[in-house]
Amino acid sequence: DVILIGFSQGAMMSMQCLLINHEKLGAIIGYSGALREENIDAANDKILNGKHKFSDTPILLVHGEQDEVVPFQSLAKSKNLLNSIGFNVQTLSRQNLAHGIDPEGISKGMDFLKSLK
């Protein structure tokens, strides 16, 4: 299985690939990224009865609360948008982290990967 892991714009690209890809991905880990409603709209052909055809794909989103590049509120918005089309999203917020990745985020990502079947 292909697992996409991205930071900032890479996280955004990973989530977009998940939504529009014609093949199922193994998982997504996104650090300090964001998803917009337009991204969901671009996947309309993959959404049936309000649920994305690959909504069982595991997703972890990690974001720093002090992020000034991609606002921290993007974490909840991205999660809610993905939830709205059937995805179950795990999240981790990092209290004193700006736009970056810290050891706790890496550790959570590793634990997430180890939990995949």
Q: PLM features: residue spans?
A:
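C-terminal catalytic histidine-bearing segment of alpha/beta-hydrolase fold enzymes
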Residues: A76-K117
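Short beta-strand/loop motif that positions the catalytic acidic residue
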Residues: L60-H63, D67
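Short glycine-enriched nucleophile-adjacent loop
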Residues: A11-H22, I28
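Alpha/beta-hydrolase fold nucleophile elbow
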Residues: D1-G6
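Active-site nucleophile loop of the alpha/beta-hydrolase fold
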Residues: I28-E37
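Short, conserved loop/helix-junction motifs that constitute active-site signature segments
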Residues: K46-D56
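Short, proline-enriched alpha-helix->beta-strand connector loops that line the catalytic pocket
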Residues: F54-I59, I85-N88
